[in-house]
């Protein structure tokens, strides 16, 4: 059987989520009898194997496939993918360039724009614009919309994301986010139903297989699927989502299109808002979460693919496609 190294942890804010994803993957590998090793990347970026610091070259010795269970910067932005590509080691998920495009939310939008998908209007704000923030805030509302949503330009798990109903909240939120992040994305807030759609390669004789649409309902009527809601078990996630036939068809087609245009490999998950029968593309994730609370495994389970078999499938297609 393939010898698998699981990469988890990492220097991003999503260290804890990555550790959970990696732990779930390791459990699946034990159940499938894959020979494996657990490589934890510390918050400082050191690679640890059995508690000892190793160079990537040493840690990857005698490995057939790397399962990337990292999230956020370093894991999803193409950095670790570049390391693995240089070493010639097969790995799960998209290659470095596609990962970098998807991780930068504006770059992903601009890549998708010529392909006809609807998207919320947006504007990127850089930290160096802080000195003229007061004069720019009214312009932001005029350009983007009366109600806004802001998030870091490059991040995952909804970290830092928030709903902005007015100018006072926008200024406060921008000051807070730009203190941590160099750039943020200000988007038009579209009130509608949240949906997410997973895509997988080479499953059931389909080169691009679209999983059932998931409808996401945040608790207590809140306006967004926050980082806290993703992992506290309070959000209602309905598989398949309660969308019309035409809405589901649009969502599935849009997710498959994003997967192809960004040149994702093995698996991805795209997020959308549905309003009045129209589908708005928000972003694409090249390394969807794989914890017990994560959406991608739930969608796979809805078509009869259990977690252990999902992990095995990703390993096998990674080994074949990257040889």
What is each PLM-predicted segment?
Residues 36, 90-91, 119, 148, ...:
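Hydrophobic beta-strand scaffold residues
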Residues 39, 184, 188, 196, ...:
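A short glycine-rich, hydrophobically flanked beta-strand micro-motif that places a catalytic Asp/Glu
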Residues 2, 116, 244-323:
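ATP-dependent carboxylate activation and anion-phosphoryl transfer catalytic cores
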Residues 1-107, 114, 126-139, 316-323:
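ATP-binding N-terminal substructure of ATP-dependent carboxylate-amine bond-forming enzymes
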Residues 125, 161-166, 199-202, 275, ...:
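Short beta-strand-to-turn element immediately C-terminal to the catalytic PLP-Schiff-base lysine
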Residues 1-8, 101-193, 204:
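Active-site nucleotide/adenylate-binding loops and adjacent lid/helix of ATP-dependent enzymes
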């Amino acid at each position: 059987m393939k010898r698998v190294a699981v990469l988890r942890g990492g220097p991003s804010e999503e260290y804890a989520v990555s550790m959970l994803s990696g732990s779930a993957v390791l459990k699946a590998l034990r159940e499938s009898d894959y020979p494996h090793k657990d490589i934890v990347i510390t918050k400082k970026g050191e690679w640890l194997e059995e508690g000892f610091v190793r160079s990537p070259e040493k840690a990857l010795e005698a490995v057939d496939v790397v399962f990337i269970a990292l999230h956020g910067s370093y894991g999803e932005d193409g950095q670790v993918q570049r390391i693995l590509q240089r070493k010639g080691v097969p790995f799960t998920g998209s290659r470095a360039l596609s990962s970098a495009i998807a991780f930068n939310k504006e770059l992903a939008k601009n890549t998708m724009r010529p392909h006809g998908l609807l998207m919320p209007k947006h504007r990127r704000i850089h930290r160096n614009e802080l000195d003229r923030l007061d004069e720019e805030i009214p312009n932001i509302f005029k350009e983007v919309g009366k109600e806004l949503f802001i998030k870091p330009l490059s991040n995952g798990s909804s970290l830092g994301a928030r709903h902005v109903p007015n100018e006072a909240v926008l200024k406060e939120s921008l000051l807070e986010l730009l203190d941590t992040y160099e750039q943020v994305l200000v988007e038009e807030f579209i009130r509608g139903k949240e949906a997410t759609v997973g895509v997988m390669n080479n499953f059931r004789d389909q080169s691009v297989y679209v999983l059932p649409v998931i409808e996401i309902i945040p608790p207590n009527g809140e306006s967004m699927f926050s980082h806290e809601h993703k992992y506290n078990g309070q959000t209602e996630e309905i598989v398949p989502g309660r969308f019309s036939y035409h809405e589901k068809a649009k969502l599935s087609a849009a997710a498959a299109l994003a997967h192809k245009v960004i040149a994702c490999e093995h698996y991805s998950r795209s997020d959308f808002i549905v309003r009045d029968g129209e589908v708005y593309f928000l972003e694409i994730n090249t390394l969807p979460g794989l914890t017990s609370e994560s959406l991608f495994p739930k969608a796979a389970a809805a078509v009869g693919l259990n977690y252990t078999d999902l992990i095995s499938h990703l390993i096998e297609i990674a080994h074949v496609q990257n040889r």
